[in-house]
UniProtKB/Swiss-Prot annotation:
The encoding gene: rlmN
Disulfide topology: C104-C340
Gene3D superfamilies the UniProt entry points to: 1.10.150.530, Aldolase class I
Role, per record: Specifically methylates position 2 of adenine 2503 in 23S rRNA and position 2 of adenine 37 in tRNAs.
Keywords noted in UniProt: 4Fe-4S, Cytoplasm, Disulfide bond, Iron, Iron-sulfur, Metal-binding, Methyltransferase, rRNA processing, S-adenosyl-L-methionine, Transferase, tRNA processing
Domain of life from the UniProt record: Bacteria
Positions of [4Fe-4S] cluster binding: C111, C115, C118
Protein name (Swiss-Prot/TrEMBL): Probable dual-specificity RNA methyltransferase RlmN
MF annotations from Gene Ontology: 4 iron, 4 sulfur cluster binding; metal ion binding; rRNA (adenine(2503)-C2-)-methyltransferase activity; rRNA binding; tRNA (adenine(37)-C2)-methyltransferase activity; tRNA binding
Amino acid sequence: MKPSIHSLVHQTMQEWVLEQGEKKFRADQIWEWLYRKRVQSFEEMTNLSKDLIAKLNDQFVVNPLKQRIVQESADGTVKYLFELPDGMLIETVLMRQHYGLSVCVTTQVGCNIGCTFCASGLIKKQRDLNNGEIVAQIMLVQKYFDERGQDERISHIVVMGIGEPFDNYNNVLNFFRTINDDKGMAIGARHITVSTSGLAHKIRDFADEGVQVNLAVSLHAPNNELRSSIMKINRAFPIEKLFAAIEYYIETTNRRVTFEYIMLNEVNDGVEQALELTELLKNIKKLSYVNLIPYNPVSEHDQYSRSPKECVLAFYDTLKKKGVNCVVRQEHGTDIDAACGQLRSNTMKRDRQKAVAAVNP
């Protein structure tokens, strides 16, 4: 199985070109064809020699993904189901925001974090995506607009799809390098956000990288007992260890951290929990931001339901009165398989049902 050309960061592409006996500037030409002109085949790279095109075709593919399903919401959200070369399925979501087009990418096939409210973890991690498979999600979403003649360009990226990004650390970092490259897609680092469920040691590593990418932490509970009951990762990285890493990140980078907090009815949405959260954030209040997330129900996790609006507002008001910066996240795609992992999970169910029906007509 040939790798995608998108797996090469700019420097690696320069090295590959030199290994082929070509001049270094050829790498810049290939890069421009891929990320500025966004071609779908090497044959479209008309300023390259036939010999170099043949070498590219022999060693790489341009697009490693196959589009299986596209769902468009009334609010402009678009959800994509892509098939990988090995037949595995992943999801990508485009969201229209007031500040531009934002794409949520997946970094792993399945997830081992095991959050008890999440559709992504219904299927355990099968493998990491390589850099090229993550980049290709962005390129195919952009192609969706290019083909329609819509003069719109992806401006923001959130790494919050299926999987734990910091469990696929090096591929995710190379993804950042590729899409941030000023000769390519040139998406600013401050327009990119990566979300972790709390791998404390990787948060420290990320602080030391010196990149300008934004950090979000999936917190979802203000104390260890509650967090461990809904997020098993808290047993390995309890709140004390997690917040020591977060404080190190803030001291090292002087950058704000966003805390994701999903609102689960009668689980973590009480004023008591809001007060606990303000206490937890008191030392980093100036550089923290809480994102309150309305819950998208998942049939396999029917023990949970969405917090009533009045509970969300009471929680929000409590944080605000204590000086915590917070917002209630705007919902997207509520009329399609909205929750992360739902489209993939539902498609896999239907595929299994078809297979069983074929065996037992």
